[in-house]
Amino acid sequence: MAITKYLVSALAVAGLAFAKDCAGDLTIENQQDVSTLSSCEKWDGDIVISEVVKSSISLTGVKQITGSLKAKNSSITELSAPNLNSIGDALSLSTCTALRSLDLSSLTKVKTLSLEALPKLQALGFTRTVSQATSILITNTDLTSLQGLDLETVGDFMVTNNPHLMEINVNKMTNITGYLNFAANNKQLSVKFPNLEGAHNMTFRNVSDASLPSLHKMDGLLGFYSNFFMNISAPNLTATGDLVFTSNSAVMNISMPKLETVKGGLQLANNSLLEDIEGFPALKLITGALDITGKFKTVKLPSLKEVRGDANLQSTETFGCDPWQKLKDSDVIRGKLTCRERQEKPKTGDDHSGGDEEGHKGAAAAFAKAPAAALLIAFVGALQFFL
């Protein structure tokens, strides 16, 4: 009995010692510091790569980090953790301008992924693919694709200022609960979400293709700004918040055949090759403002029953204002109607302050939010190179 008690006590003490040795916040300044992890499959705390590191670091053995794995302003050249499969909090690599190789070949789960100002990093190094993450930020890298990300759902998904990023294809993603923003990547960037069914806010800027064949419902803004595609389609979209198409210089066709409700404003502005606006045959309700300006010759919304805000239609061409006046006279358009043909400089609505009892404001304010956020993210990302 005494021997049994002794063994139990010894094992308990050993367990506590082991737990203590594999816990806390660890700062790594060289490869020798990694020896602290040599007997730890699980590290309970954060691991931080110091700014003084100027070579490669290999975290062999550790399989799980309950906290974060971080590096900021470090001169690390290679980071390897081939056995690491889970990071409980953040994988954050920021302003590591010498980092050229990332090997996290077993990683499948991380809470937040943040890769910022990594100008030499060309591949993610997620061989098994990361399938769980709540937030992703990738900005100012040399990545050519996002191969290694295979998420089904995500919160925020920000990808900006990656000059060689040519393709984003997230096959399994079905839902985006936060804000998605793609901006200022390679001009040939093709974005494909073949199975995405729902999203909160999404903005696409400077992309050559955006494929959303399964998108069914948006809760917030769906915006397309300064893109290079000729055609854009969301064949299964039935409802969205604000819907914006601005300064898409090559677009000639917009098709959303099942869209019935815009809970906010609908704006099409400065799409210089868009002559015929006929891609919304089922649209019935716009709770905010309707704002269409450009060089269009045709506007057809045959199912429209209600516009709760103002309606502004201005074109350099003749498109016919009589049908719109009839909609105003029949109270389909609840706010102010501005309809002008053959305008040298068509103007967008100055103050689309319409909306419904739920507080949906008109186009002008809502349309400005996402572009401003995108520009701020892009600016902050670029600024990191100089800090």
Swiss-Prot record:
Entry superkingdom: Eukaryota
InterPro entries, alphabetized: CWI-Assembly_Regulator, LRR_dom_sf
Propeptide residues per the UniProt entry: 365-387
Example of a GO cellular component annotation carried by this entry: side of membrane
Region entry Disordered, spans: 338-362
UniProt signal peptide: 1-19
Residues annotated as transmembrane: none
One record GO biological process: fungal-type cell wall organization
Post-translational modification: The GPI-anchor is attached to the protein in the endoplasmic reticulum and serves to target the protein to the cell surface. There, the glucosamine-inositol phospholipid moiety is cleaved off and the GPI-modified mannoprotein is covalently attached via its lipidless GPI glycan remnant to the 1,6-beta-glucan of the outer cell wall layer.
Lipid-binding residues (covalent, GPI-anchor amidated alanine): A364
Annotated compartments: Cell membrane; Secreted; Secreted, Cell wall
Compositional bias segments (type: Basic and acidic residues): 338-361
Cited Pfam families: Ecm33
Membrane topology (UniProt): Lipid-anchor; GPI-anchor
Annotated keywords: Cell membrane, Cell wall, Cell wall biogenesis/degradation, Glycoprotein, GPI-anchor, Lipoprotein, Membrane, Secreted, Signal
Sites where a glycan is attached: N73, N175, N201, N206, N231, N236, N253, N270
Entry similarity comment: Belongs to the SPS2 family.
Its biological purpose: Required for proper cell wall integrity and for the correct assembly of the mannoprotein outer layer of the cell wall.
Name recorded for this polypeptide: Cell surface GPI-anchored protein ARB_01627
Organism listed in the record: Arthroderma benhamiae (strain ATCC MYA-4681 / CBS 112371) (Trichophyton mentagrophytes)
